[in-house]
Amino acid sequence: MNEHQDLQKSFLETVSFDSNGLVPAIVQDHESGKVLMMAWMNRESLEMTLKNRKACYWSRSRKKLWLKGESSGNMQDVHEILIDCDGDTLLLKVSQKGGACHVGYHSCFYRKAKSDLSLEICDTLMFNPEDVYGKKN
């Protein structure tokens, strides 16, 4: 086993997956520091991400691996993966191509609460979801 494989093994053994075999992953733009999204990873998706340096997650609703940008083309190139002190949350620093959010915004955190408790759009719309995913029935 070479040193790189040994480091990967050590990292994977450090991750504390929950009872469903998942760990939350916060995704951040590696240049600006802007938080783009939160997704879930299982061991297989994390291994794929480490190997290919393309963000791959676990879709809880579809119950399958989800290569980010597979349908939309809005891929995430992974620069770094950090792990928190408890080993139960990951931070992926990525280069985002297009929008990270499936509703078309650069970040999934595109709304903020105003003092009157109403919502305000605070991000850039990058694409029309109907153009990418088709119309919902």
Curated annotation (Swiss-Prot):
Belongs to the PRA-CH family. Zn(2+) binds at residues 85, 101, 108. Gene3D superfamilies: Phosphoribosyl-AMP cyclohydrolase. One of its GO terms (cellular component) is cytoplasm. Pathway: Amino-acid biosynthesis; L-histidine biosynthesis; L-histidine from 5-phospho-alpha-D-ribose 1-diphosphate: step 3/9. InterPro entries: PRA-CH, PRib_AMP_CycHydrolase_dom, PRib_AMP_CycHydrolase_sf. Mg(2+) binds at residues 84, 86, 88. Catalyzes the hydrolysis of the adenine ring of phosphoribosyl-AMP. It catalyses: 1-(5-phospho-beta-D-ribosyl)-5'-AMP + H2O = 1-(5-phospho-beta-D-ribosyl)-5-[(5-phospho-beta-D-ribosylamino)methylideneamino]imidazole-4-carboxamide. GO terms for molecular function: magnesium ion binding; phosphoribosyl-AMP cyclohydrolase activity; zinc ion binding. HAMAP family: HisI (MF_01021). This is Phosphoribosyl-AMP cyclohydrolase. The gene is hisI. Keywords: Amino-acid biosynthesis, Cytoplasm, Histidine biosynthesis, Hydrolase, Magnesium, Metal-binding, Zinc. Binds 1 Mg(2+) ion per subunit. Its cofactor is Mg(2+); Zn(2+). PANTHER family: HISTIDINE BIOSYNTHESIS BIFUNCTIONAL PROTEIN (PTHR42945), HISTIDINE BIOSYNTHESIS BIFUNCTIONAL PROTEIN HIS7 (PTHR42945:SF1). Pfam families: PRA-CH. It comes from the Bacteria. Its EC number is 3.5.4.19. It is found in: Cytoplasm. Homodimer. GO terms for biological process: L-histidine biosynthetic process.
